[in-house]
Amino acid sequence: MTEPVRFARREDIPGLKALWRRCFPGEPEEAERFFETFFAGDTFILWEEAGEPVSMAALLPCRLRLGEERLPMRYVYALCTHPDFRRGGRAAALLRFAEEAMAARGVAALCLLPDSEKLLRYYEALGWRRAFHVPAGGSGAPGGGDTLEYPEEYAAYDDWLQALDPGEPAELPGLMKDLVPGLPAELHAAMPRPMN
């Protein structure tokens, strides 16, 4: 049986917003702002059950600087599964789909920022490696000084979120998954030193 994973379409947005609000019960306008800012043809993937999304992730475009070269990269954001459908391998299937689909599009790597030690161990068990960190008080978007570049709307969205809930700043480990075989060793050396 093939997995019901696919790229999201415009008509999926209401279901994706409902899933977002169920998994991330913060400010109600957050889902509206996020989808208005980031929805595009290949930026959202979902797992569908009975015509409704039960697991999703955003694959936000960014670039990895490697010397003078700029490599396309995707920032995996808002990976979530409805509580009634957890522990069925759906998130792992979404990540596999993301790896295959983005590699086919020439994307060099995926990155993400797990917000707990439990998630960090989960992603590492799936083959992700620690590659950078976002210092306390830094942007929630992938950082790393001059190593990662992301569009201005990411920073604007992150600033908007911080204004909604300033909270305590935390240092976050960043994980990467290489999609292109034989990426140069400088890729790893260029990334800021990961947290221990």
Segment roles from a protein language model:
Residues V5-L79, P181-N196:
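A conserved beta-strand-loop-helix scaffold within acyl/acetyltransferase catalytic domains
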Residues G15, L19, A93, F97, ...:
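Alpha-helical elements of Rossmann-like donor-binding domains used by nucleotide-donor carbohydrate transfer enzymes
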Residues P61, H82, R87-G88, Y123:
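Non-catalytic interaction surface on structured domains
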Residues A78-T81, R87-E100:
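Conserved acetyl-CoA-binding loop-helix of GNAT-fold acetyltransferases
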Residues L95, M102-D115:
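Conserved GNAT acetyl-CoA-binding A-motif
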Residues K118:
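Conserved functional hotspot residues or short segments at active or partner-binding sites
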Residues G127-N196:
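Amide-forming acyltransferase catalytic core, primarily the GNAT-like/NAT-type
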